[in-house]
Design a protein with these regions (language model features):
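Extended alpha-helical targeting/anchoring segments
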Residues: 1-342
Length: 342
């Protein structure tokens, strides 16, 4: 709604999640999980933008880098392991924000909007809340084990009121990426569970690619990605370089495609982000009307669900994950959300 002036957000905010959290990362440890290598980075940020401060900013960065090296060489305290199969721990109960009958009513209303020609597709979701007495970082460690994904994140943050919270996720999907002047998006739509055997796995993959509904939905979202990139890329540079391949994850497989384009030199990564947000795979098509329908049919604001977790760097690059399979934790309560494309 910040760049679509006709859109209004009327669904109530029930969880108090901040709309945006931005951080300037000055000191960074980059871990290559394949090679086991670690790079320590201390950015010399001259916030005053004065030449007289440049040398001081550099010297401060060098001092911080030296301290990071000393900290990295210090053995970490011995922490107890997390037993993810501990059956002595009482299993907390999920609390569904939306009753089944109310969700079904929302789906039927969404289908009518499609029949009426308002949208081709819309994603209707609901929130689940659960008590979470565990240490948030233990939650992340378990998630890495049970559901590894291309984007894994653990964020310890503070909102404007000074309240601490965590965002923990394992997203499989990129919203948008910019690398050296090239924009990339990787629409994911269509899914099946992983098979118990290689033969069953292959059977499910063939069924998925033969499903007309799944394929139709996927092609529509590929076209939406092409349209998003065409707004910010050099004319005729947008192309589908990979169409409808099966990508397998620990518990699920998806149909995935890749759309790329050369970013207009007069634009920045922020412009590219604006063209793609929110994700069509989490809202629908056309996006503005789909967002209006979601705001009408869902009983509460989505919070981080369907938003993004990622970074902009000093070189003009960007990598943004769609915030799905993501939990918001505060005061020993976790909220997660899931949706279905109609």
């Amino acid at each position: 709604r910040h760049w679509e002036p006709t859109l209004r957000a009327e669904a109530p905010d029930e969880t108090g999640q901040p709309e945006t959290v931005l951080a300037l990362a000055t000191d960074i440890a980059v871990v290559d999980h394949v090679s086991g290598s670690v790079w320590l980075i201390a950015n010399a940020v001259n916030v005053d933008d004065k030449s007289t401060r440049a040398d001081a900013a550099y010297n401060e960065a060098v001092a911080r880098l030296d301290q990071m090296q000393r900290d990295a060489a210090t053995p970490a305290p011995d922490e107890s392991r997390v037993n993810i199969l501990d059956e002595t721990v009482a299993q907390p109960e999920l609390r569904f924000r939306t009753e089944k009958s109310h969700y079904e009513q929302a789906v039927e209303r969404a289908k009518q909007y499609i029949v009426d020609g308002d949208v081709f597709q819309v994603v209707i979701s609901q929130r689940l809340d659960i008590d979470s007495p565990a240490d948030p970082f233990d939650v992340y460690r378990v998630l890495r084990t049970l559901n590894p994904s291309p984007y894994m994140y653990f964020m310890a943050l503070t909102d404007a009121q000074g309240r601490d919270f965590n965002v923990i996720g394992s997203s499989p999907e990129t919203l948008i990426k910019v690398d050296n002047g090239h924009a990339m998006t990787f629409p994911i739509a269509g899914s099946r569970p992983r098979g118990a055997t290689p033969e069953e796995d292959e059977k499910f993959a063939k069924e998925l690619l033969a499903d007309p509904k799944e394929c139709s939905e996927h092609i529509m979202l590929v076209d939406l990605s092409r349209n998003d990139l065409s707004k910010v890329c050099v004319p005729q540079s947008v192309e589908v370089v990979q169409l409808m391949d099966i990508k397998r994850f620990s518990h699920i497989m998806h149909i995935c495609s890749t759309v790329t384009g050369k970013v207009d030199p007069s634009l920045t990564a922020f412009d590219v982000f604006k063209s793609a947000f929110p994700a069509g795979t989490l809202s629908g098509a056309p996006k503005p009307r789909a967002v209006e329908i979601i705001d009408e049919l869902e009983p509460a604001d989505r919070g981080i669900y369907g938003g993004t977790v990622g970074y902009f760097d000093f070189s003009g690059n960007m990598d943004m994950a769609i915030a799905i399979r993501t939990a918001f934790l505060r005061d020993h309560e976790a909220s997660v959300q899931a949706g279905a494309g109609i």
